[in-house]
Design a protein with these regions (language model features):
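An accessory alpha-helical subdomain
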Residues: 127-175
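Hydrophobic beta-strand scaffold residues
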Residues: 37, 57, 96-97
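Short loop/edge segments at beta-strand edges and connector loops
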Residues: 41, 58-61, 101
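ADP-ribose/adenylate-binding Rossmann-like module
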Residues: 72-77, 83-109
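E1/E1-like adenylate-forming module used to activate ubiquitin-like modifiers
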Residues: 99-148
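Glycine-rich, highly charged phosphate/nucleotide-binding loops
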Residues: 50-68
């Protein structure tokens, strides 16, 4: 069973093993949230050129040394045995791992996500139906459009002012 959680990955090493379409999508997702990513592969999908200034691209085959200091690892190669090896290593070393072709070896999954500034909405079917999660995400994108980015910013500013101005916890909650 999965537990929903938001994780701060600032100053954490993020490593993706693999250079194909899935690896690119995973790297782009981390970058869209403001993180730098290390990607290891012998070959890279051409789209990696679009994000090479925000990634450390290493042209090499997978070696354990590449993930020794990683906090979070994505195994996205086209080789199930390599992915399995990465997943097992991460489990042994208590690292967060997403093995793209074997959810049983993954310690986390990434929900379908909508980001509107500081408003982040994640939708997951716990891997049962990614297409349904994607459909729900599209429905929510229509409801929570780009205007929510500014709205959330305003609410955050108001909340700070209320917290500073009032000492009474009941009053703070009412406001």
């Amino acid at each position: 069973m999965n537990y929903p959680i938001m994780v701060n990955l600032n100053c954490k090493e993020i490593t993706i093993i693999g250079g194909g379409k899935i690896a690119y999508r995973k790297a782009k997702n981390f970058i869209d949230f403001g993180y730098k990513v290390k990607v290891i592969s012998l070959d890279f999908d051409e789209r990696f050129k679009d994000i090479e200034n925000k990634t450390e691209l290493i042209r090499d085959e997978y070696k354990e040394e590449y993930i020794e200091n990683s906090f979070i690892v994505v195994a996205a190669t086209n080789n199930r045995d390599v992915n399995k090896s990465i997943g097992m290593y991460c489990a042994e070393k208590n690292k967060l791992a997403n093995v793209v072709d074997d959810p049983t070896l993954s310690s986390y999954i990434v929900p379908a996500t909508i980001k509107r500034g500081d408003l982040i909405i994640g939708v997951s079917t716990s891997g049962k139906s990614p297409s349904l999660a994607s459909k729900i995400k599209k429905d929510l994108e229509r409801v929570y459009d780009d205007s929510y980015e500014e709205y959330i910013q305003l609410l955050g500013e108001l909340r700070c002012k209320i917290l500073k101005k009032y000492d009474d916890p009941v009053r703070k909650k009412q406001l």
